[in-house]
Amino acid sequence: MSAVSSIFDTPIPSAAKSSPSGSNKRPLAQNGHHSGEKQSKKSKKASKKQLIDLLVQEHARELSQNDSSASTVSTPKKKKKKNASASDINTSASKNVNAAKKKPKEGLKINLQNSKKKRKNFEVLNSSQQHADDALVETSFNGESLKNNSNHSTPVSKKPKKKNKQMPHPLAGTPNLAIKQEPQTPKANGMQRTSAQDSIVVGREKFAWVIHPTPVEDFMINYWEKKPLLIQRKNPSYYSNLLSRAKIDEMLRQNNIEYTKNIDVTSYREGQRETHNPDGRVLPPDMWSFYEEGCSIRMLNPQTYLPGVYEMNVKLQEFFHCMTGANFYLTPPNSQGFAPHYDDIEAFVLQVEGRKHWKLYSPREPAEMLARVSSPNFTQEEIGTPILEVVLEPGDLLYFPRGIIHQASTVPGHHSLHVTMSVYQKNCWADLLELFFPHALAQAAETHFDLRRGIPLNLHQHFGIVHSDSETPARKQLISHIKSLVDKVFSEDAIDSAVDQLAKRFQHDALPPLISNTEQSTTVYGSSFSHNPDGTVSLRVPFTENSTVRLLRCNVLRLVSEEEKLRIYYHTDNSREYHEYEPNFLEIDQDAALGVELLVKMYPHPVAIRDLPVEDKIEFAKSLWEKGLIVVHGQ
């Protein structure tokens, strides 16, 4: 019987540093198969793929039968929860334990390709388990949704550019943007922790809290990437648990926060935007002195240090399937910190303290709609007339899409503190196709002989800026031929690969998961060690073949095929600081990949270890458990 090589089988060199390619890592075991294994490899893989399909279909039938006899849906069967246990175990870090080197076994191997010397800190939440009955809303979008019904004029850019007059602006119905709501708290309060099994549902509930009382479905259909949304709640404490001036001061005293890296000191006076960052650590007296002088304070990564912002972002990243960022802005009374500009993110402004006067402007031209890069600073003359002016008060929210020009200033007698939550940076179709075409072209060139033929000798005489207005028969014939070659580039496999690469990018961008106290007892973060009389330490593996396992989060890992290898990229070992470490990944063989495939397709429902389509089931589960990728129920 083949076995999984434990990730602790070989000591990790202290000087090693992880890299995406893994070229400077020493694998813990080398993948290998005997010749007899090679002959039956395809048949074994086919039979195991059939087993995966049967297990998924059988589980779907069970859920369907349960749905017909129950009043609620989207929850696993209760009898599978009897084995779950909960404890309030607080752990700030898990120790790295190096076991003696074992002889590599044949068959399934999992090779560690990351040299972290210690696990990252995970915040433990005291929470009660709560079932999530909502289903993920899937909404499709197309270009027809970008309409402009307003009569606002849009100034023309000073640069002479060709303009598509048929392209509409994305702002519609601007007089009806405000939603005025009496004080009201949604059912799922923003700081109420849940341990629902589906992380996408949990993320959706958190987003519902952010934009309450606007329903998520209504927002995605009518506002997302289309037009601004203003919510005025008359509830000053709605976002108060995210941060405050007192929490900012405490954060500065307890952490080594640095200018430029973490915090910018800015001002905007008489049409000039300036940055006043000194070098070194941000000390409270210095920062408050800048503030008293009329400067704005921007923090680039509050989620790293402020638990409330981290808790919000780590849940939202599961719903949006992309990096969720945040900045906070602290502005003194009667001042402005930034010039008019537009951003390359979907922006959600959450007003926490004070008041701020916002002005929004239409994109100046169609090319700026849903912008892929942020703009330079604009002058007041370049941006025209606002399409929305509003003063945000504590508890209010303002959303606007990428490309919407904006500026904000405080009003006399009131400071302002707000959080800007951002999503969907570099996450559009163009970004996906940038990943698609290089792989698709390389793949097609191997398959299609025509793509490898040399270009015609006279190509230069028919194309280029000099010949761009030519309509010769030769040019038309060449254009037709090039179009036929482009058609051959399309490949479904290349689309799968491009989406995998986009998801792999997310694994590097993502915040590490937030582990609830319920999950503590069922993951490696709540594991225990036995201290033996001879001075050795043994890790207690809390499962058998009768135990059930599931992924910690829906998006906790991504199986990727690259460099003729299968890799699992994951983010449980990420830092809260953006890209502090290189991407984390494990190299696996095809046998292990089938096990990962089953766990992904069954999520959020558990799988019995005995049903995993791998040779050594316990060792396979143990290797994923040791990296914090699965939760286990049943001893």
UniProtKB/Swiss-Prot annotation:
E.C. code: 1.14.11.-, 1.14.11.27
A biological process term (GO) from this entry: negative regulation of DNA-templated transcription
Pfam families documented for this protein: JmjC_2, RIOX1_C_WH
Gene Ontology molecular function terms on file: 2-oxoglutarate-dependent dioxygenase activity; histone H3K36 demethylase activity; histone H3K36me/H3K36me2 demethylase activity; histone H3K4me/H3K4me2/H3K4me3 demethylase activity; iron ion binding
Positions with biased composition (Polar residues): 141-156
Catalyzed reactions per annotation: N(6),N(6)-dimethyl-L-lysyl(36)-[histone H3] + 2 2-oxoglutarate + 2 O2 = L-lysyl(36)-[histone H3] + 2 formaldehyde + 2 succinate + 2 CO2
Transmembrane segments: none
UniProt-annotated location(s): Nucleus
InterPro entries according to UniProt: JmjC_dom, NO66-like, RIOX1/NO66-like_C_WH
Cofactor remark: Binds 1 Fe(2+) ion per subunit.
Biased composition (Low complexity): 84-99
Cofactors, names only: Fe(2+)
Gene Ontology cellular component terms for the protein in this record: nucleolus; nucleus
Family per similarity comment: Belongs to the ROX family. NO66 subfamily.
Name the UniProt record assigns to this protein: Bifunctional lysine-specific demethylase and histidyl-hydroxylase NO66
Organism: Aedes aegypti
